[in-house]
From Swiss-Prot:
Modified residues (N5-methylglutamine): 153
Family statement: Belongs to the universal ribosomal protein uL3 family.
Alphabetized InterPro entries for the sequence: Ribosomal_uL3, Ribosomal_uL3_bac/org-type, Ribosomal_uL3_CS, Transl_B-barrel_sf
UniProt keyword terms in alphabetical order: Methylation, Ribonucleoprotein, Ribosomal protein, RNA-binding, rRNA-binding
GO cellular component, one term: cytosolic large ribosomal subunit
PANTHER family: 50S RIBOSOMAL PROTEIN L3 (PTHR11229), LARGE RIBOSOMAL SUBUNIT PROTEIN UL3C (PTHR11229:SF16)
Assembly behavior: Part of the 50S ribosomal subunit. Forms a cluster with proteins L14 and L19.
Segments for region (Disordered): 134-154
Protein name: Large ribosomal subunit protein uL3
Species of origin: Dichelobacter nodosus (strain VCS1703A)
PTM info: Methylated by PrmB.
Length: 212
């Protein structure tokens, strides 16, 4: 359990190494991650560091959150995220102070979690990669239908989790073991190799990889 950061997805580009090999990277802007609360085992039952990112109008902030931010003496934030840390690491952090980008280094492997792009209502072929049925030989208007979804009188219901048509995307998903290609401390940019879930401007949670 180690500290992470919250950033915003800027988009994708490519960079070149010393040999001229191009690599596709995702650019993440790391806005100030201000510590809004420190949780300890004595008061909360576990050790964690809570960070606040972005800006929210006071008129758009609930009274509960407004009081929470006022207690930490920080401005209202758009997103609050919590990272569990070890008891030895908790002493390094202080409420009201930012978490620095220096906690990561180039070449390090990280796990990224974000909300995927919503695709709206989609059928089973697009949503779940179903094969589809025969195009000819007796098939009548059933080319893209999923087929049978039920059982017999027993159990007489459709099992939970059955792959069917519905809203595609707009779900929290994770990509593990992504390499940090480059870090720009001056501009607070993190360049990650490959793609990252979510749309441009979406919030991305980055933490050290659990499988590295």
């Amino acid at each position: 359990m180690t500290m992470g950061l919250v950033g915003q997805k800027v988009g994708m580009t490519r960079i070149f190494d010393e040999e001229g090999t191009a690599s596709a990277v995702t650019v993440i802007e790391i806005q100030p991650n201000i510590i809004s609360q420190i949780k300890t085992d004595e008061t909360d039952g576990y050790h964690a560091v809570q960070v606040s990112v972005g800006h929210r109008k006071s008129s758009r902030t609930t009274k509960a959150l407004a009081g929470h931010f006022a207690k930490a003496n920080i401005s209202a934030a758009a997103l609050v995220k919590e990272f569990r840390v070890d008891s030895e690491e908790i002493a390094k952090y202080e409420v009201g102070k930012p978490v620095e980008l220096a906690i990561f280094e180039q070449g390090q492997r990280v796990d990224v979690r974000a909300r995927s792009i919503g695709k709206g209502y989609a059928g089973t072929i697009k949503r779940h990669n179903f094969r589809g049925q025969r195009k000819t030989h007796g098939n009548s208007v059933s080319h893209r239908v999923p087929g049978s979804i039920g059982q017999n009188q027993t159990p007489g219901r459709v099992f939970k989790g059955k792959k069917m048509s519905g809203h595609m995307g707009n779900k929290m998903c994770s990509v593990q073991n992504i390499e940090i290609a480059r870090i720009d401390v001056e501009r607070n940019l993190l360049l990650l190799k490959g793609s990252v879930p979510g749309a441009k401007g979406g919030y991305v949670v980055i933490r050290p990889s659990v499988k590295a």
